[in-house]
Amino acid sequence: MKKISNILLAVTFALPLFTACETDNDSNPILNEPDTFTLNTPAYAANNVYDLKNAQTVELTCSQPDYGFPAATTYTVQASFEQDFIEATDESKANYTVLESTSPTAKINVDASELNNALLDLWTAVNGEQAELPTEPVAVYIRLKANITSSGKGVCFSNVIELPNVLISKSTSSLTPPKTMFIVGSMLDTDWKVWKPMAGVYGMDGQFYSMIYFDANSEFKFGTKENEYIGINDNRVTVTDKAGAGVSGSDNFVVENAGWYLFYVKAAVKGDDYQFTITFYPAEVYLFGNTTGGSWAFNDEWKFTVPATKDGNFVSPAMTASGEVRMCFKTDLDWWRTEFTLHDGEIFYRDFNLIDSWTEKGDGYSIQGSAGNVIHLNFTAGTGEKK
């Protein structure tokens, strides 16, 4: 077997995330639709082995697509064993794999385990279930897809780069992403007896979310099952506070600032255990679709008002047109991954491949709105209504 040396644990693409801002003039920016953008070849790619089993991340860097103005951009990693990426047709599958995790910046820390598993699946798809995995490094080709965040606009693809020495390995762990996630704490009940189940992010195994009101200095823990009690001091846990919640603690999580937050948990398999990433997002709920006159982006004109109390209602702006009501939370993901509706007066979180309408789920899942209607949502009670 070829000796593996100089194991590279990170590969590099870099560029800060630019976001649109107001200018001194009243003109609207004009969207340029670029054909491509530059993905950088790592400086030492030719002489190093990317051992995905023993690496943590593969770091990539690229230039931002030229949209004609600074725009928040989402990057998706695609990988193939062939230099020419071939799209799927009615007769054949695509010859590349797409990683589920995306990046909001042009410096992308690709999870090595996720890349390894994606390449394993692609190898099996190309060579058959009985095909042996190569014991020596193989060439892997990478490209990026970019689009303007939370929209279908500005889609373009980077150039293809080669990583000539990538070692992929069979997973030695039988652990799979958790199917459930719960949160418990003083903001739910003072006796810590209520284990609140969280909604699963559609299409993202091991990821969960819940809109929760935290009293000032609330304390809580979470778990993949009831009575697991995972705290902030667990070395498997990292916390990102994007909402100014003021998260701290030495055992229990402590939320300093009272208010509504979207609590988000990502559980990733790392060997024989999980790594948990906790994110606090602002409590942002939006109307989408036909009842807004056709808005399919996070437009603050269609953001719900946030109540000041635990038992208050989130209230939508008045609809301006007729059609099916579409609602979602704002995270770093595509809007439809955290979409929900109302069914028999209760909030129902998307759990299926919705193509065009909630009618595909069954009777009573599609809310039909008209001009002047508003939606009231009570996330503490888990209920809602159209008025």
UniProtKB/Swiss-Prot annotation:
It holds the Pfam family SusF_SusE. A lipid is attached at residue 21 (N-palmitoyl cysteine). Its main location: membrane. The carbohydrate binding modules (CBM) mediate starch-binding. Monomer. Interacts with SusF. It is a lipid-anchor. D-glucose binds at residues 326, 335, 350-355. This is Outer membrane protein SusE. The gene is susE. It comes from Bacteroides thetaiotaomicron (strain ATCC 29148 / DSM 2079 / JCM 5827 / CCUG 10774 / NCTC 10582 / VPI-5482 / E50).
